[in-house]
Amino acid sequence: MSLLAGNAFAADSIPASLTGAKGDPARGRAIVANRQVGLCLLCHSGPFPEERFQGNLAPDLTSVGARYSEGQIRQRMVDSRKVNPQTIMPAYYESEGFARVAPAYRGKTILSAEQIEDVVAYLATLR
């Protein structure tokens, strides 16, 4: 069963919050910068002067809020394969359709709905 059953989708967007509420940008920034939780900076770079090593495999996050709506950011966080089937970005809020998942992680998402909304709220501020 999909975790997103009942959510409306636009072509490249999930317009509605996964939780029904706005996320917290400060918590979202902490998730993006945390190398144990989001791992975003493994591939992305952005406005994180305190982080020495940032990725160069994926787009810079500096102006992501100017390039995408909150719904478009949310879709890319939930499962960017819906937008780009060739992406290497993990699906942060899907729990099905993966190969070779360790037993402890089966049926679980990388981030919770609340964490997704926090990251969306933060990334939307990057203009």
Which functions belong to the PLM regions below?
Residues 19-22, 31, 45-79, 88-102:
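Gly/Gly-Pro-rich "capping" loops immediately C-terminal to redox-active cysteine motifs
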Residues 37, 79-83:
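Glycine-rich, acidic and aromatic/proline-enriched surface loops and short helix-turn segments
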